[in-house]
Amino acid sequence: MKIVVLAGGRSTERNVSLTSGHKITHALQTKGHDVAFVDLFLGNELKDGATIDSLYSSDPVEKDYDIDDEVLTDDDINKLREDGSTQLFGPNVLEICKTADIVFLALHGGDGENGKVQAVLDVFEIPYTGSDTLAAGITMSKKVSKEILLFNNIPTARFVAAYRHQPMPEMPFEYPVVVKPSNGGSSVGTHIVHNEAELKPAVEDALRFDNEALIEEFIKGREFSLGVINEQPLPAIEIEVNDGWYDFEHKFVTGNTTKFVTPPNNLPDDVHEAMKQMALDAMHALGLTNYARIDFFWSPETGLYVIEGNTLPGMTPLSLIPQEAEVLGISYPDLCEMIVNGKLALLNEK
């Protein structure tokens, strides 16, 4: 099968995406597929006589790509392109994608995950992994997705929204609170705020990455994540951070300070099963298909709360879904192929 792995792009999570993309490329090549790795934003100018066919390879040569702990801004990323243009799709990206049997979306955050890329691929009838345009856009907006979850009686933290050049909203809950960009991921621009003095700087920082920020009530409890592949829930994974909380650095850089436990210790079986069902309920409410990840808080006192859904979960060595799949004996290459085959099966049902 000819597969394009689309990664990078223009997002604060660009570096995470590149790491996921290189790992996915290598994994699918080990399964015998012809794979082309393409950076959404930089594209490929096909210089020196290169052709689109020459970009594909089934030779699994693994490329190490360390995640830079620096969060890139749009200006930083725009400087990577020689011609200075800022359009989302780089040179020849669409032409390359048109030659594939399916595009594996290894994009994270921003325009890579908010439905824009999916919409363009839909226009050209190019198959791709993950959820469709509408579900991607809904889930990328934490505000909209939380409203949908609440409408469907799926527990999630209460919140208010803050905007640039607008008065700070009144909060119907006490400190501490969580401040985050409404459209973002990997905990970029996210803060735990303990008092009024910390609130304004935290909101201002979150608004550097988006024009809308959420102020959420802080839910005290253990943090879990649960992936779903082709309607099958994986075992939950518990995230234990030795110092601080599960921010960008803990997620992708300093893995030694974060402990992942799957299946979780001392999690009642009935709670684990309820978490699996709630993950499916959240996916269905948000319209997610193929694969996704749902994050939770739980304690005996508060019960289960959905934090958010993730339409294109990370696939780096420290990412959660690969670790959950491994518990079931699913190797990383098999996991990637399951995602591809699952999406093709969905498309064939239409």
Swiss-Prot record:
- What are the residue boundaries of the ATP-grasp domain, all occurrences included? 146-341
**Keyword terms:** ATP-binding, Cell shape, Cell wall biogenesis/degradation, Cytoplasm, Ligase, Magnesium, Manganese, Metal-binding, Nucleotide-binding, Peptidoglycan synthesis
Catalytic activity line of the entry: 2 D-alanine + ATP = D-alanyl-D-alanine + ADP + phosphate + H(+)
Q: How is the cofactor bound?
A: Binds 2 magnesium or manganese ions per subunit.
MF term (GO), any:
D-alanine-D-alanine ligase activity
Chain positions recorded as ATP binding sites: 172-225
Question: Does Heme appear among the keywords?
Answer: no
Q: Where in the cell is it found?
A: Cytoplasm
Name of the protein in its database record: D-alanine--D-alanine ligase
Q: What is the originating organism of this protein?
A: Latilactobacillus sakei subsp. sakei (strain 23K) (Lactobacillus sakei subsp. sakei)
Q: What is the lineage of its organism?
A: Bacteria, Bacillati, Bacillota, Bacilli, Lactobacillales
